[in-house]
């Protein structure tokens, strides 16, 4: 919950990135650059080659400073706001983080010695963050004119041991050794922070004192030379500045505002294999990397909001505890190298710095202290200092620290030099003052002379002004008079321009009227010529149309006569074919009747044979029954056991014979039914043929009637058309002679309408005749096709009936043979049974077996005889049926061939008639098309209508000016124009406007006349 609260209300750690330029060694070795900085977009791009692939990683920070960035740029953009917040009462921390040799110490300290070339001891351009922050603090405090006090501490963390870099140097060797053996302890302050017991706090009053302390402490800091850095820091340093500022509340109470600035220069992480560290240097590098690794773990824990943050794993992280996740505003300056051999350390630094951006601190303003509390603390400090002074002054003379003595001597020398410089400046100022006094006296004399000349010039000016006023008055009068003349001339010019415009309009109207008259005469001539040409075209068309109509009438008459002849031929052919068909039907009836009688006789013979066979079988059965009865007494006991078997065999034989008789009767009945069906179909075919020829005769008669009617209607329409055309032409000719110009268009329209209507009626009549003939021909074709289809169907049915009869006879013959075989089989089974009985009763029934065997043989002989008779009857019946069927089929085929021949003749006749009609239709269409083309050529091409040429003038009403308009064109009198000008432009108003002589818009007298 607390981490989420800090995240909501906290402030992110500010992370800056600075890239150093290439060193001399790197430039000599042409080391590739793998890091590029974009200051504007605050991005850093690192190029990598992983598995042969070029990969760029981009990191974003709060601010980015490239190799060309100066110390002042970094300080002004990043550190100035932090120092201002320290002066507002916040605790702030700035520390540099990065690999060894990337410029951390240079960024934090730089060149902190005072520049001798600058006045008043200014800072050099290479000064780092610490000296610039010190200077800003004292400049701000001096500018505020507030009461303040500043304390500084400077400690070093070397191999996890804290050393005071500001400790006095005059300690005895024993004391120094004891102090080295017992490093300064690090203790908790009870408020979440830490403090170092025994750490010296130096009170300073100026920036120079801080610079001196900074130089003294930096000289004590442990450094060593490695392969990567000639002056590598082997320890972490922490420079703290504590500021107390006095403030007064509106109630008059005095409070002390406290702010603290921690400036940390971390030792750089290094790779021992590349830095060349050995023995003690290797141990130093291990401790440095260990503390920096702990710092990275702390950053990761804070970013991931873990429950445990390992602050206590290193004294460095304990010192920076309040700066990382505490109540301090923190700024991290990450320094990197652009060279490729430092790529691994550069990526590590960028990763940790980028993660540190997500750390959120919760800065708070330090609580202001009461003045009494601070005075109480100061009293204790004063008592401690008094004890030290008393102990120091037990000797003779005045005791002063060496640093203070050297400082006062240097200040005295500086002040003496400044006094000498100021004395020389005073002498120079006196000389300049004397020169200025001499110049002032000369200036006064020149001023008096100029005053005299000014008086004379003013007198001349007053006289000149009077002359100028009179001249201006005369000039105004002259200009006013010229304005009057210009106004009169302009009005007269306007009248003149209007008259000229009116004259030009009249001239153009006159020329246009002349051209219109000539155009009208030309149009009348063109219309007369066109009327004469059209009259000739109409006369020629009348003669040609009469000739074409007479030719058309003759062709229609000849076509009608050909149609009558053709219809008579079709009628004769149909009658002859009808008579032949009736004869064939009579012959067919006779043959069918004879076949029926023959079938009846054969059926009676078969029935007689069946009856005889039945009687013989019954006699045999009776004899067998009697014989069996006579021997029943002797073999009762034995027959009792086989009675059922014997009776069943004879029952089966009896049933087989009965079924044989039934099959024969059914065969005869079905044969009669089939012949009866054949007769009915033959009668239906005969009736249909008669009906067909009757319909054909009716259609022929209808065609003759319709052709005659069409011929009469065509002749009448042609006669009516000729009469109407002659009357219309005569009346139109009379009217054209009377008024040709006005009635040409109406004559042409009536001629067109008359010809079009008559041609349309003629075409309708021709098309209706063609339609009727086509319908008639199609009806005849349909009847013929229907008759042919019926006859083919009848032939196929008759052929199928005959084939089915033959198949039926063959099937019945097979059935009869099967029944006979079954009878023989039953007899053989009975014979076998009797044989078994005879063998079993051989001794008792030898005589009876002999009798039964003779009876069976006689029955078999009778059966064989019966089969022979049935076969002979069947053979005779098959021969007769086959002969009659062949005769009927031949007769039907002959009738079909005759019918096909007659139908083909009729079809040929119809086709020739169709061709005749088509040729007649084509001739009529060609003739009508010729008449239509001639009419179109006459009335659309030769008969020319008048076409506008565009030269005929349109009707225009000329604009005739009235007398009042002509009178208004006169120019006004000059006196009237002068009065009008003076009314609109008075002399007084003109005089007020023309205060100066104006340049005229025209040269004098250039356009007056």
Swiss-Prot record:
Residue span(s) of domain Kinesin motor: 12-359
UniProt xrefs under Pfam families: Kinesin
UniProt-annotated binding residues for ATP: 98-105
Positions in coiled-coil regions: 406-526
Record key words, sorted: ATP-binding, Coiled coil, Cytoplasm, Cytoskeleton, Microtubule, Motor protein, Nucleotide-binding
Biased composition regions of type Polar residues, renumbered to the chain: 997-1009
Residue numbers spanned by region Disordered: 862-882, 987-1009
Chief location of this protein within or outside the cell: cytoplasm
SUPFAM superfamilies, sorted: P-loop containing nucleoside triphosphate hydrolases
Signal peptide: none
InterPro entries: KIF11-like, KIF11-like_kin_motor_dom, Kinesin_motor_CS, Kinesin_motor_dom, Kinesin_motor_dom_sf, P-loop_NTPase
Compartments where located: Cytoplasm, Cytoskeleton; Cytoplasm, Cytoskeleton, Spindle
Biased composition range(s): Basic and acidic residues: 863-882, 987-996
Domain of life (superkingdom): Eukaryota
One function term, GO molecular function aspect: microtubule binding
Gene Ontology CC annotation, any one: microtubule
GO biological process: microtubule-based movement; spindle organization
Family to which this protein belongs: Belongs to the TRAFAC class myosin-kinesin ATPase superfamily. Kinesin family. KIN-5/BimC subfamily.
Function noted in UniProt: Responsible for microtubule translocation. May be important for the organization of phragmoplast-specific arrays of microtubules. Plays an essential role in stabilizing the mitotic spindle. Required during mitotic cytokinesis.
Name of the protein in its database record: Kinesin-like protein KIN-5C
Organism: Arabidopsis thaliana
Gene designation per UniProt: KIN5C
């Amino acid at each position: 919950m607390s981490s989420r609260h800090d995240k909501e209300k906290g402030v992110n750690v500010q992370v800056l990135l600075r890239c150093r330029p290439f060193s001399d060694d790197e430039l000599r070795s042409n080391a590739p650059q793998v890091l590029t900085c974009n200051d504007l977009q605050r991005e850093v791009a690192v190029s990598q080659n992983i598995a042969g692939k070029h990969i760029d990683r981009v990191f974003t920070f709060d601010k980015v400073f490239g190799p060309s960035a100066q110390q002042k740029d970094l300080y002004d953009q990043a550190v100035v706001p932090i120092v201002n917040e320290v002066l507002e009462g916040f605790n702030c921390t700035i520390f540099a983080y990065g690999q060894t040799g990337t410029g951390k110490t240079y960024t934090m300290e730089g060149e902190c010695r005072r520049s001798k070339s600058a006045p008043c001891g200014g800072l050099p351009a290479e000064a780092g963050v610490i000296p610039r922050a010190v200077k800003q603090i004292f400049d701000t405090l001096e500018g505020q004119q507030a009461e303040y006090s500043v304390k500084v501490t400077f400690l070093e963390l070397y191999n996890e041991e804290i050393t005071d870099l500001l400790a006095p140097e005059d300690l005895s060797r024993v004391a120094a050794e004891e102090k080295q053996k017992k490093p300064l302890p690090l203790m908790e302050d009870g408020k979440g922070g830490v403090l170092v017991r025994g750490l010296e706090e130096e009170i300073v009053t100026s920036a120079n004192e801080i610079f001196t302390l900074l130089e003294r402490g930096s000289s004590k800091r442990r450094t060593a030379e490695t392969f990567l850095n000639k002056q590598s820091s082997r320890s972490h340093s922490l420079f703290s500045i504590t500021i107390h500022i006095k403030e007064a509340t509106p109630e008059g109470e005095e409070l002390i505002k406290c702010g603290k600035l921690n400036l940390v220069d971390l030792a750089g992480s290094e790779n021992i294999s590349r830095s060349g560290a050995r023995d003690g240097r290797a141990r130093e590098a291990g401790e440095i990397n260990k503390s920096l690794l702990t710092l990275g773990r702390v950053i990761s824990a804070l970013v991931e909001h873990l429950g445990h943050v390992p602050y206590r794993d290193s004294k460095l992280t304990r010192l920076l505890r309040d700066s990382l996740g505490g109540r301090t505003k923190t700024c991290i300056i990450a320094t990197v190298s652009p060279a490729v051999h430092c790529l691994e350390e550069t990526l590590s630094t960028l990763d940790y710095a980028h993660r540190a951006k997500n750390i959120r601190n919760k800065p708070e303003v330090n609580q202001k202290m009461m003045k009494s509390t601070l005075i109480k603390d100061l009293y204790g400090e004063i008592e401690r200092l008094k004890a030290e002074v008393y102990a120091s002054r037990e000797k003779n003379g005045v005791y002063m620290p060496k640093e203070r003595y050297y400082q006062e001597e240097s200040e005295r020398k500086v002040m003496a030099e400044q006094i000498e410089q100021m004395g020389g400046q005073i002498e120079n100022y006196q000389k300049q003052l004397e020169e200025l006094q001499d110049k002032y006296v000369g200036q006064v004399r020149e001023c008096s002379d100029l005053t005299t000349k000014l008086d004379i010039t003013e007198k001349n000016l007053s006289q000149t002004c009077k002359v100028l006023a009179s001249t201006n008055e005369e000039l105004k009068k002259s200009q006013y008079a010229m304005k009057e003349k210009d106004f009169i001339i302009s009005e007269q010019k306007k009248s003149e321009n209007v008259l000229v415009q009116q004259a030009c309009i009249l001239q153009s109207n006159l020329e246009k009227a002349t051209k219109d008259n000539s155009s009208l005469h030309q149009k009348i001539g063109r219309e007369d010529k066109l009327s004469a040409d059209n009259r000739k075209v109409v006369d020629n068309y009348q003669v040609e149309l009469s000739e074409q109509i007479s030719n058309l009438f003759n062709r229609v008459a000849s076509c009608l006569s050909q149609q009558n002849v053709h219809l008579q031929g079709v009628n004769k052919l149909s009658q002859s074919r009808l008579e032949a068909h009736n004869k064939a039907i009579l012959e067919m009836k006779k043959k069918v009747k004879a076949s029926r009688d023959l079938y009846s006789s054969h059926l009676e013979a078969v029935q007689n044979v069946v009856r005889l066979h039945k009687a013989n079988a019954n006699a045999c059965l009776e004899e067998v029954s009697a014989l069996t009865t006579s021997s029943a007494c002797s073999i009762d006991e034995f027959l009792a056991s086989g009675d059922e078997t014997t009776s069943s065999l004879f029952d089966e034989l009896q049933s087989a014979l009965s079924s044989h008789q039934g099959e024969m009767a059914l065969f005869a009945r079905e044969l009669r039914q089939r012949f009866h069906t054949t007769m009915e179909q033959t009668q239906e075919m005969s009736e249909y043929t008669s009906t067909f020829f009757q319909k054909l005769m009716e259609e022929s008669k209808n065609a003759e009637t319709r052709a005659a009617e069409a011929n009469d209607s065509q002749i009448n329409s042609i006669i009516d058309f000729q009469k109407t055309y002659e009357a219309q032409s005569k009346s139109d000719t009379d009217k054209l002679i009377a008024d040709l110009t006005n009635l040409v268009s109406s004559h042409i329209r009536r001629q067109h309408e008359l010809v079009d209507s008559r041609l349309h009626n003629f075409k309708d009549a021709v098309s209706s005749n063609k339609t009727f003939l086509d319908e008639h021909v199609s009806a005849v074709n349909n009847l013929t096709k229907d008759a042919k289809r019926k006859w083919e169907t009848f032939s196929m049915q008759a052929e199928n009936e005959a084939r089915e009869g033959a198949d039926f006879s063959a099937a019945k013959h097979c059935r009869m043979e099967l029944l006979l075989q079954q009878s023989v089989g039953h007899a053989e089974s009975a014979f076998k049974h009797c044989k078994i009985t005879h063998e079993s009763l051989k001794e008792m029934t030898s005589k009876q077996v002999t009798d039964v065997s003779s009876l069976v043989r006689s029955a078999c002989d009778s059966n064989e005889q019966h089969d022979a008779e049935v076969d002979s009857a069947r053979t005779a019946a098959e021969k007769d049926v086959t002969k009659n069927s062949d005769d009927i089929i031949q007769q039907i085929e002959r009738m079909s061939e005759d019918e096909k021949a007659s139908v083909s003749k009729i079809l040929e006749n119809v086709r020739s008639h169709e061709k005749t009609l088509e040729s007649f239709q084509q001739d009529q269409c060609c003739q009508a098309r010729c008449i239509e083309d001639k009419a179109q050529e006459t009335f659309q091409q030769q008969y020319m209508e008048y076409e506008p040429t565009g030269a005929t003038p349109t009707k225009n009403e000329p604009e005739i000016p009235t007398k009042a308009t002509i009178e208004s064109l006169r120019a006004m009198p000059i006196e009237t124009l002068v009065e009008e000008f003076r009314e609109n432009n008075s002399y007084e108003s003109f005089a007020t406007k023309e205060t100066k002589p104006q340049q005229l818009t025209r040269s004098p007298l250039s356009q007056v006349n």
